[in-house]
Amino acid sequence: MKPIISPSILSANFAYLANDIEMINGSEAGWVHIDIMDGVFVPNISFGFPVLKYVAKLAEKPLDVHLMIVQPEKFIPEVKALGARIMNVHYEACPHLHRVVQQIREAGMLPAVTINPATPVAMLRDIINDVYMVLVMSVNPGFGGQKFITYTLDKVCLLYTSPSPRD
């Protein structure tokens, strides 16, 4: 399994967003990671679909859209229409996670699931083989520049070494 680098544009300088996207285009990065926050699921608000649309026009790499929002399933059509390849939703935001994962797949995107630092990896047992990837948050979601939570590395190692029927 080859690691995929997916730089987030969350910390980009929006006055120079096109330059930052160009830098990612010319890099070894595999994807462009876009964090969308609603101020409800997480305590901060980032950018919304107009910025996603702008990034989609400029990016030459697949878009990895990470929705830190309540009811992400409502936005599957918009995320798909704006060109996302991967749609990433939080385990904690989806009471019907299996349904949401299936809807993402049916829309033609790769479903991904994110867990917050305090969420046990075991919570993904029933869904792990239905998702393209798992994102383990190494900070509490909602703000950039936080201190890395070291115990999240154990979660990554556990996921990496767990047997999967897809391997």
Language model region names:
Residues 1-77, 81-82, 94, 124-130, ...:
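Conserved N-terminal beta1-alpha1 strand-loop-helix module at the mouth
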Residues 5-8, 32-34, 63-67, 87-89, ...:
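Hydrophobic faces of well-ordered beta-strands that scaffold small-molecule active sites
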Residues 85-156:
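Conserved anion-binding
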Residues 160-167:
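Conserved small/polar residues in nucleotide/adenosyl-binding loops
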Residues 42, 51, 141, 145-148, ...:
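Short, flexible micro-motifs
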